[in-house]
């Protein structure tokens, strides 16, 4: 009887080991698309008092991005986005797409707009599974950027030094770096102050 119980216990053991390992394996698989990836996040460029587009200064920033990100010189490396992602257009704003349009034309790569502002979890999950680009540039609305950073595993307040993204700030670049396991390396992530237009950094 004792022998029979021992054999049954040994038979159950592999199943227990497999079940305890499954979440880790699934987690690794979910982050595959972010292995050794750099994610760049900007707020859309300046907006006018009315309308869905950019202000004249916003158009200048969008044009400046076409050069700033081709290539972005950061930490002794030249980074060129291989994917451009913007919030989907809405009735009130097409600004994230318009912010990336000059860069898109210069790099000859399309702007992807699969998700709305609040769908940050879906965006991050999609990148974790399917992304093959080593550098991804995302343009989003400022009210949702902290949530986007959090979805990637970061802390927006710690990165920006603010409780929330300020209403009048358009010249911050968020840099998120991921390791060879697809996990965010917060110590290597940063906020960069752009100096593209007069008044930037003041």
Please place each PLM-identified region on the residue numbering:
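Periplasmic-binding protein-like
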Residues: 135-139
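Residues in and immediately flanking transmembrane alpha helices
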Residues: 17-18, 57
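Bacterial N-terminal signal peptides that target proteins for export
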Residues: 1-10
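Bacterial N-terminal signal peptides
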Residues: 9-17
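Alpha-helix initiation/capping motif
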Residues: 2-3, 119, 141
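Active-site-proximal alpha-helix that buttresses catalytic centers in soluble enzyme cores
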Residues: 25-133, 144-202
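Sec/Tat signal peptide C-region and signal peptidase I cleavage site
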Residues: 20-24
């Amino acid at each position: 009887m004792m022998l029979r119980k021992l054999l049954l216990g040994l038979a159950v053991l592999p199943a227990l080991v497999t079940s305890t390992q499954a979440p880790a394996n699934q987690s690794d698989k979910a982050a595959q698309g972010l292995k050794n990836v750099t994610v760049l996040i900007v707020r859309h460029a300046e907006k006018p008092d009315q309308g869905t587009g950019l202000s004249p200064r916003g158009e200048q920033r969008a044009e400046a991005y076409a050069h700033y990100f081709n290539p972005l010189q950061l930490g002794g490396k030249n980074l060129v986005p291989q994917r451009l992602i913007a919030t989907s257009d809405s009735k009130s704003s097409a600004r994230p797409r318009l912010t990336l349009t000059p860069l898109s034309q210069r790099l000859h790569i399309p702007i992807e707009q699969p998700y709305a502002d609040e769908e940050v979890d879906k965006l991050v999950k999609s990148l974790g599974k399917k992304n093959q680009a080593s550098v991804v540039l995302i343009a989003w609305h400022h009210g949702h950027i902290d949530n986007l950073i959090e979805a990637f595993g970061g802390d927006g307040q710690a990165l920006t030094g603010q409780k929330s993204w300020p209403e009048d700030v358009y010249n911050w670049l968020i840099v998120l770096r991921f390791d060879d396991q697809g996990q965010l390396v917060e110590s290597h992530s940063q906020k960069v102050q752009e100096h593209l237009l007069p008044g930037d950094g003041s």
